[in-house]
Amino acid sequence: MDIEERIKLVLKKPTEEVLTVENLRHLFEIGAPLQHYIGFEISGYIHLGTGLMAGAKIADFQKAGIKTRVFLADWHSWINDKLGGDLETIQEVALKYFKVGMEKSIEVMGGKPEKVEFVLASEILEKGDYWQTVIDISKNVTLSRVLRSITIMGRKMGEAIDFAKLIYPMMQVADIFYQGVTIAHAGMDQRKAHVIAIEVAEKLRYHPIIHNGEKLKPVAVHHHLLLGLQEPPKWPIESEEEFKEIKAEMKMSKSKPYSAVFIHDSPEEIREKLRKAFCPAREVKYNPVLDWVEYLVFREEPTEFTIHRPAKYGGDVTYTTFEELKRDFAEGKLHPLDLKNAVAEYLIDLLEPIRKYFERHPEPLELMKSVQITR
């Protein structure tokens, strides 16, 4: 596989942004060690925005010949008050539920979970020189920049926070350099931390990424954040600027079960959630169901996606590209309920291996029922 084919895999949907493609090409050309990582807070049940979006991208990285790593951010979850702020509970959930759920998610999206390295943050944070890296990075970042970066924790700028949360962004940047990561991967909401990593890369004294004497800047790959199924906090949305302002409130949330489908939901739960989903007729710009169709169903194109309808409503229709489906929906030729039903059945089939695994091994879900899921 040549360099351009590997770059195409990195750019493939659900990727929304690569910082930068030029640097990615440079890393390929000089033969630098390609180490990917994506970090997750341990905060509750895995929904499709976490499991399938990240799983799909991990599969792409593997096909491009890049080593993949999932970072189970237990300390970060503790700092951010997840699972009641209990570190031992967070660690137990990370290893007994989250790791297994991500392995299964990667598998259904075409990846090889056995080739993914899972690392618990504690394993590296307890080494003394990790904190040298945190301080080294911190000395190159202003306090105002850190305050602007707390949005990576799902916090709002100006929100009252404890001091530990100001350390979090610098830890996230340190995770990249301490692990020798050349490709930092996350959802678009983690962009601020990755931009800091790129900017400080050549200034670091402790754990810079060096290849043949050159200090390397990491590449940041940001995937699309699936919209939650709930109605937006404001409707109609009048402009792209307005959409950007409320987009964080429109993503899937573990604390709002009807905004998300979880990887182990039953067929009945999936159908009910899609039935209740916000999907206004002819609306193609701010429509969560269409968003899911674009990034889950039509990740690969062409793909055959059949929508079953009674003959009196036009009969079955098959689409091979998202643009075809989007056009029919915009013109009112495709009814929202028919689309919702088809997406529900698609997800039921896609998630069947995960569902069956947890039916055979119920212990992880039993553990989750016993813990306090916060935020």
Curated annotation (Swiss-Prot):
Top enzyme class: ligase
SUPFAM superfamilies given in the database record: Nucleotidylyl transferase
Binding site for ATP: K254
Broad class of the protein's primary localization: cytoplasm
Molecular function, one GO term: tyrosine-tRNA ligase activity
Record-linked Gene3D superfamilies: HUPs (3.40.50.620), Tyrosyl-Transfer RNA Synthetase (1.10.240.10)
Keyword Nucleotide-binding in annotation: yes
EC number(s) from the headed UniProt entry: 6.1.1.1
Reaction(s) this enzyme catalyzes, per UniProt: tRNA(Tyr) + L-tyrosine + ATP = L-tyrosyl-tRNA(Tyr) + AMP + diphosphate + H(+)
Family the entry assigns: Belongs to the class-I aminoacyl-tRNA synthetase family. TyrS type 4 subfamily.
Alphabetized PANTHER family for the sequence: TYROSINE--TRNA LIGASE, CYTOPLASMIC, TYROSINE-TRNA LIGASE
Subunit details: Homodimer.
Main function: Catalyzes the attachment of tyrosine to tRNA(Tyr) in a two-step reaction: tyrosine is first activated by ATP to form Tyr-AMP and then transferred to the acceptor end of tRNA(Tyr).
UniProt-recorded name of the protein: Tyrosine--tRNA ligase
Originating species: Pyrococcus furiosus (strain ATCC 43587 / DSM 3638 / JCM 8422 / Vc1)
Organism ancestry: Archaea, Methanobacteriati, Methanobacteriota, Thermococci, Thermococcales
Encoding gene per record: tyrS
